[in-house]
Amino acid sequence: VVEESQLYREMVQNGTKGIIGEPTNLEVIHAHKGSVEIKATSRGVAGHSSSRKNVSANLSMIPFLQEMKAIHDEVETEVKWQNDMFEPPTLSWNINVKDDSPALNVTAGKTICRMYLRPMPGIDVEPLLTRVRQAGDRHGVKVRINHWGNTFFASSDSDFVQDSLKLAHRPKSKTVSYGTDGGVFTEIADKIVFGPGSIEQAHTINEWISLEQLSLGTDMYAKMIRHWCCGK
């Protein structure tokens, strides 16, 4: 849509207001974190551990992981990587590791480390990603980085956010640590994330929304449409 839609281009040019529908318990959200996936792969030669004709993929992954642990600890403790606007105020650097060894006495032919971090507005994570790539080069680990979603930010003092608060009868806007489609529509200046239901009930096995929230949300969306589209 962002790359090919002419309608979206017109929306950007005309200053269209945007409401990203997500379960916020009808709270007005003016900022959220982004998302970045890192996939690091090391390769070896699978074989029975009693033979010399094998090389464990874990051996090149281990020193790489040591550097990733150092980055993890750094972003958890150093203020320059944190933003107190959010809870938690960190990048939430998560590390998962898995190899393909079928048994304890068989060396791993491939080991994969998947990492996930949540960038925040005002913090440039590219220096960290560069360090990950450099660590991969040093240890023979292939690194692939995917930017899944950008950060989302609108000034809490903007007229649009303040009007939204009045319509929703909320005292102040909030931030959340998850991501939404709002991270894609970055060229829309006036925007909020807003909707019925709770994020704790969304994306679960038994995903649900209360009828009360659904009814309130329907009424609120209608109210916002009348206000901004019909001038009422």
Identify the residue ranges that each predicted region occupies.
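Metal-dependent amide/peptide-bond hydrolase catalytic core
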Residues: H30, E37-K232
